Every structure is written in C-alpha cells, then in structure tokens.
Amino acid sequence: MTKRITKVCIPTAGSGKRLKYLTKEINKSLIDINYKPAISYIIEKFPSNSEFIIPLGHKGEIVKNFLKIAYPKKKFIFVKVKNFDGIGSGLGLSLLKAKKFLKTPFIFVSCDTLFEGSIPNLKKNWVGYSSTKNNGQYRGIEFNNRNEIIKFHKKSFKSSKFKKTYI
C-alpha cells in the first residue's frame, strides 16, 4: 500500500517585489487576507501529521517566529536562503537549499497560493493548476495534446491553449 504524502514545501524566501509597499516590512506569506496571514490558509489545509519545509529569505525570521508561535504542535524545518533577491535568486534556489529535506515525495505550495476545497489524498505526482486570462504574472505549465505536462514556464510566459497557471 502506498503511503500518503505528508511532506509539504512552502517557499517564503522571495521579496514579493510585485506587491510593492505591502512587502517592504513583512514577508508576502504573512500578508493578511480577511484577518489571517496567507500562509495560515495553506497550513490549515493539511493534516496534523504533515511536516512543513519552509525556505526563508526576505523577513524570514518574522515568518519563522510567527509559525512557531501560531502552530506550536506542527513540525517545521526552516531552511535559510541568503540570496533571495537579484541574480541567481528565485524559486529554484529555494528548492535547492531545501533539497536534503525533499528526498521523498512532497507537496509544493507557493506561500501566497489560496485555494478552495481540500488537499487530495496524494500518493503520487500531482499538480494543481488554474486557467486565467491574465497569466503573465504567474508561472505556467504547458501540456501536450494528451494532457501530459511537457514544460514548466517562468513568469510572463506567452499563453496558448495548452498552457495553464499552476499553483
């Protein structure tokens, strides 16, 4: 029997430049949405036995302190990402820094992704995505005509009928 995936990676290292003044003093994962930080909506979607890998960068100590205080019974592994802005920074670097904790199947969720419904009982590779007309500000997925993923795109990719925005 295949075990359910319980490891969750939520990178929070980025500086959130597109949010401008909102992220000057706080990490984008902690921006309040209806009186609750965005990252809380994500963490609360997962079962109590989940292990969270959190790459930290911009205002990382604030994120770390918040999570330890708000969720004292949750298991967190914090990974420091020093180069979180500028040349060589980005999501790929955050995942590389967390690599030693991600040697088993895991669920990746961007720190500012909000979604309805529950997390499926995942036992194998899976990607959640959404269609959007204004997809230039998001990363994207390109599918072939058999609905198989053939490429992940950086932000500002050109849209086509086989491309979707992933979460």
Which ranges hold each PLM region?
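Short beta-strand/turn micro-motifs composed of small residues
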Residues: 12, 56, 110, 130
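Short beta-strand-to-loop acidic/aromatic patch adjacent to the donor-nucleotide binding site
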Residues: 104-114
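Conserved core of the sugar-phosphate nucleotidyltransferase
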Residues: 114-167
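Glycine-rich phosphate-binding "P-loop"
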Residues: 21-24, 28-31
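Conserved N-terminal catalytic core of the sugar/cofactor nucleotidyltransferase
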Residues: 2-10, 18, 32, 36-106
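Short glycine-/acidic-enriched loop or helix-start segments at secondary-structure transitions
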Residues: 20-21, 63-66, 117-120, 138
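Short, polar loop motifs at secondary-structure junctions
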Residues: 58-60, 112-115
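N-terminal beta1-alpha1 ligand-phosphate binding loop
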Residues: 12-17, 25
